[in-house]
């Protein structure tokens, strides 16, 4: 069954077959593209007419390869689409981590096409818009879930058995250094001297930082747990956008979540306590 590569190609007939594992016997009678835009991938919101009741959402968020050919080439090279599909199919069911309810996770190894169709999180959760940070308590809860992921895969043998397709991110790309250089050059006055100093140090010698990351214990990482990849449901947070999973130091996830999910004032006040909390949770989980 060929995979659709544009939102309008997600037909009722295709979706009926695709959701068969998740909701067998459900017939999708209609699909309406409510919204569509290009991001790292191509995103669309689909409204469904179906006979499955609560077994299938009536609104789906759909992630497809980007339509722009340059972006598509970069995405295919990165393996992000396949990695995220495999996460939802192979790992997510066994993890004690909150993730979206996914009804289609498919990848075509010959063409690089992929489809991820999941619940529209806005119907049951708060999806941050990036203007405000999360509370320290929510970040602490998120660190507990990351700790569960990290503990599960700190054993190299288990990683080889369950997730051999997740590998170290390596250091072949200078994308981060180029992005920092462009930001500094575009408007240096908008950045604090402290930030510029750290950025310049990274640009000049990023291998030293990479050496430090690679020196310690390794595990499977989410890889990109910033505020835009989180949702809040009750007193817990959940994680989505798993396309940058990698093997590396667990402190990459920990530091990234603390730095990117808290307001600066909260981070200054609570970051040490949060690091201690993560260590205690790790120790309690073995």
Regions found by a protein language model. Give the residues of each.
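Conserved NTP-binding catalytic cores of kinases and kinase-like/nucleotidyltransferase enzymes
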Residues: 1-111, 233-237
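Active-site acidic catalytic loop and adjacent metal/ATP-binding pocket
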Residues: 37-52, 61, 206-252
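Glycine- and acidic
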Residues: 70-74, 127-132, 240, 256-264
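Short alpha-helix boundary/capping segments
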Residues: 76-80, 130-141, 246-249, 262, ...
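Active-site activation/catalytic loop segments of kinase-like enzymes and analogous catalytic loops
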Residues: 86, 251-285
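Surface-exposed helix-capping loop/turn segments at secondary-structure junctions
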Residues: 94-99, 153-162, 283-286
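Conserved short submotifs of the Hanks-type protein kinase catalytic core
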Residues: 113-123
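ATP-dependent phospho-/nucleotidyl transfer catalytic cores
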Residues: 125-222, 233-234
């Amino acid at each position: 069954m060929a995979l659709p590569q544009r939102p309008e190609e997600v037909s009722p007939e295709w979706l009926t077959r695709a959701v068969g594992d998740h909701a067998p016997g459900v017939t999708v009678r209609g699909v309406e593209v409510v919204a569509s835009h290009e991001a790292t991938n191509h995103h669309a919101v689909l409204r469904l007419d179906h006979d499955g009741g609560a077994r299938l959402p009536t609104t789906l968020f759909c992630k497809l390869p980007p339509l722009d050919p340059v972006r598509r080439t970069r995405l295919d090279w990165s393996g992000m689409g396949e990695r995220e599909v495999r996460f939802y199919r192979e790992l997510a069911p066994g993890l004690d981590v909150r993730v979206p309810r996914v009804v289609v996770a498919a990848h075509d190894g010959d063409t690089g096409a992929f489809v991820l169709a999941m619940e529209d999180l806005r119907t049951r959760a708060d999806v941050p818009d990036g203007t405000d940070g999360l509370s320290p308590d929510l970040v602490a809860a998120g660190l507990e879930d990351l700790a569960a992921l990290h503990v599960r895969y700190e054993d190299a043998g288990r990683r080889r058995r369950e997730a051999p397709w997740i590998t170290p991110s390596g250091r072949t790309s200078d994308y981060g250094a180029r992005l920092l250089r462009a930001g500094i050059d575009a408007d240096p006055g908008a950045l604090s001297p402290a930030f510029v100093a750290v950025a310049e140090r990274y640009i000049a010698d990023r291998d030293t930082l990479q050496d430090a990351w690679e020196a310690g214990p390794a595990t499977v990482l989410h890889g990109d747990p910033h505020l835009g990849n989180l949702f809040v449901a009750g007193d817990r947070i959940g994680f989505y956008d798993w396309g940058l999973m990698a093997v590396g130091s667990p402190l990459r996830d920990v530091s990234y979540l603390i730095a990117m999910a808290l307001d600066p004032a909260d981070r200054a006040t609570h970051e040490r306590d949060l690091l201690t909390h993560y260590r205690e949770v790790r120790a309690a989980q073995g």
